[in-house]
Amino acid sequence: LSLEATDTMSLAERQVTELSGGQRQRVWVAMALAQETDILLLDEPTTYLDLAHQVELLDLLAELNEERGTTMIMVLHELNLAARVADYLVAMREGIIVAQGEAGAVLTRPNLDEIFGLKAEVVDPFNDGSVVVVPHPRGASIPE
């Protein structure tokens, strides 16, 4: 089931050392899913994956959370993907929690500037409370 869910069935007979970075990442996630634990700790599970596979993997993890009640704790540096799937975000800088809560409360212009030194707009493109971070172009004049 975990091989099917991560689309890695065709890789089952191959050595991990023969796999690309994205294939390897999906195999590691399949191995974690096969454990059927109540809690999954994932460190950058979307690393090496193209955008379509990132979304697919995070949708799978969200599905596991909804259907099995599996708690997911993961590190994600891709803010828009984190905002898309997380019920609760914790933003840290140098090991200290700077902000926590729902995506809209954490991903604000002041927080992005404080945490990442990033000048950005935070928009709700679907008018449903979801947020997307849009970085300002380098050297752009930034309205207050």
Regions found by a protein language model. Give the residues of each.
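Conserved ABC ATPase "signature" region
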Residues: 1-11
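Conserved ABC ATPase signature
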Residues: 15-19
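Conserved catalytic motifs of ABC-family nucleotide-binding domains
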Residues: 36
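Catalytic Walker B motif of ABC-type/P-loop ATPase nucleotide-binding domains
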Residues: 40-44
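Helical segment within the ABC ATPase nucleotide-binding domain
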Residues: 55-68
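ABC ATPase nucleotide-binding domains
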Residues: 109, 115-144
